[in-house]
């Protein structure tokens, strides 16, 4: 049997209210796709039964995997372990893909694969779909990447603060994910940051299509990117940030200037996000955690990497000046209004 072009992994946890819409959009890819529905120990609704229903109805496309609760990261790990597709994409069960854009992307991947030029990373736009006031905001990369051709990091332009690669914008070759040895931590939110960071040094070729493929549903009260939820789960944000500090030696990338610069920028952003949510907590314990995180960065990276982050973007949120915390939070609120990120 011919290899599937792409594996979609859909981690599902008590997702019965919205997962069908997600799955139906993925089914539009037809037989060239494999859809792995990972039921992450759901107990409160019909998620397990819905997974089994689709697996029975589409046996050549859909696999249902039931696991003990391990969190979103273990759902992604489970998908990688079981994937048979050439490419791998994670789609959260409350999100969906634009079907017309998906057909266009898969047609291009088929063409490139037939030529023997399949890229390690396919990149597309993603769209924030806000539940409260229904505006949408598209994140595109037309100023960062060449369009509709193969390229590498030497061809990459400048990323604006709102243009980081996220899980929503990427399709990795499955083998890249296996080669980099990435295993996401269990019972931890925000591991999507590891997913788009750790494999990057293993990516040798990329392709960007200016298509609004991924629709990112944002604004549910229980969502992990909800601000109050992030404050409560800040320890998980810190765990992910430490993992990212440890998983790559950025000094080993000095021969790849643009890749190293981007990864420094991304790690700086993770430090800044951690600082902001510790500031929002405002407790003495949170301040101690902030100091410990910066000490961890200093102890586990070179002096050059530490200085780049401490005195660059990451350090902006750790100002050692009077009323520095208020300035940081004011800047965060302004950015929140501009970029509508949670």
Model-inferred region functions:
Residues 211-220, 226-254, 269-303:
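Catalytic core of nucleotide-sugar-dependent glycosyltransferases
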Residues 39-49:
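A conserved acidic beta->alpha catalytic loop
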Residues 72, 95-206, 214, 218-230:
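Donor-binding/catalytic cores of nucleotide-activated saccharide
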Residues 1-25:
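N-proximal low-complexity "stem/linker" segments adjacent to membrane-targeting elements
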Residues 67-83:
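Glycine-rich, basic loop-to-helix element that forms the pyrophosphate-binding segment
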Residues 88:
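Short aromatic/hydrophobic "clamp" motif used to bind/position activated sugar donors
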Residues 279-342:
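Membrane-interface aromatic/basic loop that binds lipid-linked glycans or pyrophosphate carriers
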Residues 24-33:
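Short, acidic, metal-binding catalytic loop of nucleotide-sugar glycosyltransferases
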